[in-house]
């Protein structure tokens, strides 16, 4: 678990006055309104303005005053210190922590590392890309143990809950 929390990624410029378009990495996009400062590419910056556009956040950030300035920040992450985040209830995890975990089955066979967590109406799904793409439904009878400190998740062997090909 890192000390910084990624809450967004700058994906493009917005307009000519240095605003940036951000892809939010948090479910609570209103969090951007509550923040006074953030780290952008490791540099502390003040947030001067926040607007929302569909599924994106438009930010005006201190020191980014033109489209050319904004271009240099494309693909950089917006981060905040972890201590600014609320404590989670039991059996609830931050996606950024899960993405640091490797999944093993009960036979200690390594399945892969979580690439992303997909939210669906019924349950989340762990997306493994390598060594073989696999979607793992996050259900109590499949996901048996999650140890964030050890970055290790234990699941039932794949053949017990899905046909192996």
From Swiss-Prot:
Main location: cytoplasm
Keyword tags: Chaperone, Cytoplasm, Ribosome biogenesis, rRNA processing
Gene3D superfamilies per the UniProt record, alphabetical: PRC-barrel domain, RimM
GO molecular function, one term: ribosome binding
Subcellular localization(s) per the UniProt record: Cytoplasm
Protein's GO biological process: ribosomal small subunit biogenesis; rRNA processing
Keyword Protein biosynthesis: no
GO cellular component: cytoplasm; ribosome
Positions of the PRC barrel domain: 90-161
Superkingdom of the source species: Bacteria
Family: Belongs to the RimM family.
Functional summary from the UniProt entry: An accessory protein needed during the final step in the assembly of 30S ribosomal subunit, possibly for assembly of the head region. Essential for efficient processing of 16S rRNA. May be needed both before and after RbfA during the maturation of 16S rRNA. It has affinity for free ribosomal 30S subunits but not for 70S ribosomes.
HAMAP family in alphabetical order: Ribosome_mat_RimM
Self-association state and partner proteins as the record states: Binds ribosomal protein uS19.
Domain notes: The PRC barrel domain binds ribosomal protein uS19.
Protein's name in the database: Ribosome maturation factor RimM
Organism: Clostridium beijerinckii (strain ATCC 51743 / NCIMB 8052)
Taxon lineage: Bacteria, Bacillati, Bacillota, Clostridia, Eubacteriales
